[in-house]
Each structure stands twice: as structure tokens, then as C-alpha cells.
Amino acid sequence: MASFPFSPSFMFDFELTRILGSASSGGCEVGEFKSAVGKIKKHDAESWHAAWKEQGERAESIANEAAAAGFRIPARNAYLRASNYFRASAYMFTNSEPRVVPLSERSIANFERAAGLMDGEVMFVEIPYEEGITLTGWLCLPPKEARVEGKKPLILYAGGADATKEELYFLYGHTGPQLGYAVLCLEGPGQGMLLKKSKIPLRPDFEVVAGYVLDYFSSLAKSRPDLELDLDRIAVAGAATGGYFALRAATDARIKACVAVDPFFSMWELALTRAPQSFMKLWENGWVMDNVLDTFTDAHCRGNFQAGWEMSLGKSSMGVEKSSAMLRRFKDFSLENKKDGKILERVTCPVFLTGPGNGSEMYSSADDSTLKIKDMLKKVPADKKEIWLPSDVADGGLTAKIGAWALLAQKTFLFLDKQFEVKRKAL
């Protein structure tokens, strides 16, 4: 169903909807949004950057003024908006742009100020990974008045290809603690500052990453029993690429429920929907050389802003410099491959699975991914699989449920309450 566009660019409109969609959880103010949108030119990364940097500085100033006056909630809200606006201000740049890291650090700094003003405790966690690398996240804990019976259920919330742990707060990090859940907003390899600053790429076998995270929480629960984390009620969640990661993580038996929002089945198959089929088949079969593919894609990207941006993110996320190498690496990001077999047959926990019923307007489609995944979750009983395929934008018809996060959160926690036997009184 048609909706009002904020920009003549579909990509810009999608990302603007993403920003405005965080308003219900404190990530945006309508007046600030309108002011920024009026200054953004189609496919102009500089005007996008300037508009959101201006709003970030404005919100940061408001937050500092409120903090100096002792106004906790206004200060918290403005720091949250500043964090989101500084994140947005760097978004249309490629990761090689020198301004990306400083803007990202400013986003993190503002979120850190907001974190100290939350109703419940928000802990910055550092999780030991491989080769001396540390994964970071924000553990958002419920305030006392929001506690449910028993220990706190825990959600491991993984980002996708372009989210940050600070932006993740605006979905489950905001709603979960209000409903008694502890929520970890996590940046894994190839995400956030690990990609932008440390140049560490994504890895397809996210169950390995999840294993380190679960081990960390096992130790944390022992060293901090006062946190009352329930390791028998751990869920994993993610959207788009994060939805793929959630399904991979759900192969770990310690995960008791999975929320996969609009995941892809295969990154390679998804890429094929965005390129000339015949040309890609010729390349895959060796009839087109790598240098020809690279030249073709480079030329296409020079004349298409969205394609150029996506290609740049794809190459940096995969840790490669050439389009051909990126596409080959995409084949590893699949829920079925030669190395790991049929991954979905190792998932046994309940799964809440969603798709964009509007079709593949951005990165996935219900037919190519969601329904295929549903059918291949053979070890999950039918009554433990819940599917949601909205089509209208207001209902979550856009990829990753952009613009409908409050509704997504409601449906997610209805599902998790059912699986974790959380009892509540009707209002």
C-alpha cells in the first residue's frame, strides 16, 4: 500500500522513516525531523550529513542544559536523540570517510550520558572474543517496578549490517526492560566500531559469536547473582541480517526462543535479485572474468548512489576490496551450505519469524526468505512457529519493520511471554 514519501529517493525515504520510527522510544523529535528533512537533497550525502549533524548538536545542547538544571528525563531524552542524530549524520558516508569514526564516537558518548539517566540500570559490557578482540554491548536491565515473577529473562539482540548497539536500544532495549526483560544490545564482528574503526568483518557462523556471549553471561550470572539473570530463559533476536544471525545463534541449545525479523535465507541469492541474472550466471560459471565483473559493477555504482553505497558497505563488511570477492563471500552467509549443511534443522527452540509482506522493497521478501525458512525449520513444532507477514507500512510492511517498531515490540513480547510463561494481569 502506498505511503507518503519524505524524499524522492527511495533509499533516503527508507532511512528517514527509520529515524522517525524511533520517535516513540525517544530517538527522534518531529520538529527536529522536519527541520532536517527540509535541508536534505536527493542522493546528496553531504546535505544528509549536515542536516543530521546540526540536529545532533542541537539535541546535545538541549541535553546539556537540562542536565545542568537537574532535569533527568528531559536530559535523557535529548541525549538519546543526539545519539541517534549523530549516528544518522554518518550513515550515507562510506566507512572510508574520515568523519565516520568521530561522528560514531560522538553518538556513543551521548548514549552513554543517556544510559546513566535511565529508569533501570544500563551496563556497558565487554565480552572476550578471539585474538584479543572484545565485543561490546549495552545490557539494559528492568527497573524494580517492572520486574516479573522470578529471575529476569534475557534477550541477546544482534544488529545487522549497518545498525549500532546504540540504535538497537530504540526497539527492544527500550521496551524490554519496561516489561521485565534484560536486553543486551550487542555489536558483533563487522558491526559498529568493530567494523568502522577496527576493520573487523562480519562472519557467517554467528553461532560462534553467540557462544562467546552466552559463555560471558554464564560467568556474569555467577559473579553477579544480584543481577538475577535467568539463564534458562534466554532468547535471541535480530532484524534483516540480524535476523539471519539470530537463526544461526538459535542452533545453540542454550537459546530457548528466537525472534528473526525479516531475515534472508541466503545473502548470495538475495544479491542475485539485485543484479542482471544472465550476467551473474555467466560470471558464476566462469564465462565472465572477475575483472570484467568488477569493472561493470564499479561503472554501475558511479552512476547509482544506492548501488554505490551498498557495494561499499558490502565490501567493507566482507573485508574485501573487489566486488567479485564480496559476492563469493556472500555465499558463506546462508542457512544451507556445503560446510555447515542444513543449519535450520539444528534449530529446535520456538521461533517468531516475520517477513515484509510488501515484497522485496529493500532487502528481502516473504516468498524468497520467510516462507522458505518456515518450511525448513523442521525440528520446530508447528505450534512453536509464529509467522507475521504484514503488508501495510503502518503494520510493519517495510523491511526490518521500519516505521512500526512499537508494534513489532508488542508482538515480540507477546510471543516471548508465551514461551517463557510470563504471567501478567490484564489492565
From Swiss-Prot:
<protein>
    <recommendedName>
        <fullName>Alpha/beta hydrolase gkaG</fullName>
        <ecNumber>3.7.1.-</ecNumber>
    </recommendedName>
</protein>
<dbReference type="Pfam" id="PF06500">
    <property type="entry name" value="FrsA-like"/>
</dbReference>
<comment type="similarity">
    <text>Belongs to the AB hydrolase superfamily.</text>
</comment>
<dbReference type="GO" id="GO:0016787">
    <property type="term" value="F:hydrolase activity"/>
</dbReference>
<keyword id="KW-0378">Hydrolase</keyword>
<dbReference type="InterPro" id="IPR050261">
    <property type="entry name" value="FrsA_esterase"/>
</dbReference>
<dbReference type="GO" id="GO:0017000">
    <property type="term" value="P:antibiotic biosynthetic process"/>
</dbReference>
<dbReference type="GO" id="GO:0072330">
    <property type="term" value="P:monocarboxylic acid biosynthetic process"/>
</dbReference>
<keyword id="KW-0843">Virulence</keyword>
<dbReference type="InterPro" id="IPR029058">
    <property type="entry name" value="AB_hydrolase_fold"/>
</dbReference>
<comment type="function">
    <text>Alpha/beta hydrolase; part of the gene cluster that mediates the biosynthesis of GKK1032, fungal natural products containing a macrocyclic para-cyclophane connected to a decahydrofluorene ring system that show potent antitumor activities. Within the pathway, gkaG catalyzes the Knoevenagel condensation that affords the 3-pyrrolin-2-one ring, using as substrate the polyketide-tyrosyl acyl thioester product of gkaA.</text>
</comment>
<comment type="subunit">
    <text>Homodimer.</text>
</comment>
<comment type="pathway">
    <text>Mycotoxin biosynthesis.</text>
</comment>
<dbReference type="InterPro" id="IPR010520">
    <property type="entry name" value="FrsA-like"/>
</dbReference>
<feature type="active site">
    <location>
        <position position="368"/>
    </location>
</feature>
